[in-house]
């Protein structure tokens, strides 16, 4: 027999969980104005406002409908992510303010970034994501090529920094990206599974969206490294400037020179890719800065 979801109302928002949960701790932080309850990570996130200041709250400890794992694992992953947000602090990453345990769960509090998620599957599930003029992804794809390249530059700059810090990006996809259409700023909002190198694939199929994943992210005992992240960056370039998994030049909206850089990055043969995100980004910038966009 299927469990009947429990409806929860907090201030301006309503959502469902597998069972009742106490959110008194959250209400003390301010007025809840947004909820993000469709993630399969086990996390439940909120927008909270107090005295005109907005914060983004990420919480593990409640039985969300989409999560298939154990609550202990969700809490542990969220706790472990704290050091990532501290060590990888960057202008293009949401800013962690504080973190603490509550009841049987754990909370991370970030500064609120006023952006829209490029993979808002809860509001615009495909094909709406690609066709609805109100979809953040649709709006992003209708920005100028230059604006999209600047957004990609923020993403590549951050991952060059991640690489220098001896980390590897895991589970990076368009759902990790927030874009502010008023200021044209880009922020990364989810690095919870990024890991220190060396990192070996012990799962077979790693976490992530197949649209952005390299062959080695499906291969048991494969090394996940800088060349893997080069593939991820190239795949993101095709998602935001081209035809996504259709990596033909026909659907590419920027220059042939930039296309060739992105196409080399997503070579299935890892040896033929750029050796690092840094070398990929330098080649990309050399072309973009020469106005060969």
Predicted feature locations:
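Juxta-kinase regulatory segment immediately upstream of eukaryotic protein kinase catalytic domains
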Residues: 1-34
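Conserved end of the kinase activation segment
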Residues: 216-227
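Conserved HxN/HPN-centered segment at the entrance to the catalytic loop
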Residues: 88-99
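Conserved short submotifs of the Hanks-type protein kinase catalytic core
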Residues: 103-117, 121, 125
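Catalytic-loop of the protein kinase fold
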Residues: 159, 163-180
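Conserved activation segment of eukaryotic-like protein kinases, specifically the C-terminal portion
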Residues: 202-217
């Amino acid at each position: 027999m299927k469990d009947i979801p429990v409806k929860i109302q907090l201030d301006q928002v309503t959502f469902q969980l597998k069972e009742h949960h106490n959110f008194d701790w959250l209400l003390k932080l301010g007025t809840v104005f947004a909820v993000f309850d469709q993630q399969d990570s086990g996390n439940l996130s909120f927008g909270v406002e107090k005295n005109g200041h907005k914060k983004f709250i990420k919480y593990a400890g409640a039985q969300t409908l989409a999560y298939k794992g154990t609550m202990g694992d969700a809490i542990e992953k969220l706790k472990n992510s704290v050091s990532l947000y501290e060590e990888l602090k960057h202008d293009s990453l949401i800013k962690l303010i504080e973190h603490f345990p509550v009841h049987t769960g754990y909370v991370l509090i970030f500064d609120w970034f006023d952006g829209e998620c490029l993979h808002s599957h809860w509001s615009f599930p495909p094909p709406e994501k690609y066709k609805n003029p109100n979809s953040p992804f649709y709006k992003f794809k209708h920005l100028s090529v230059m604006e999209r390249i600047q957004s990609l530059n923020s993403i590549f700059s951050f991952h060059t920094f991640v690489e220098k810090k001896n980390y590897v990006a895991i589970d990076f996809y368009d759902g990790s990206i927030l874009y502010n259409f008023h200021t044209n700023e880009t922020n990364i909002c989810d690095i919870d599974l990024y890991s220190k190198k060396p990192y070996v694939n012990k799962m077979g199929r790693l976490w992530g969206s197949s649209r952005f994943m390299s062959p080695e992210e499906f291969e048991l005992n494969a090394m996940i490294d800088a060349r893997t992240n080069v593939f991820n960056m190239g795949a993101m370039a095709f998602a935001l400037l081209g035809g996504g998994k259709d990596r033909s030049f026909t659907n590419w909206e920027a220059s042939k020179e930039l296309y060739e850089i992105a196409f080399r990055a997503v070579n299935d043969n890892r040896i033929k890719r750029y050796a690092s995100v840094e070398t990929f980004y330098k080649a990309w910038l050399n072309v973009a800065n020469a106005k060969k966009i």
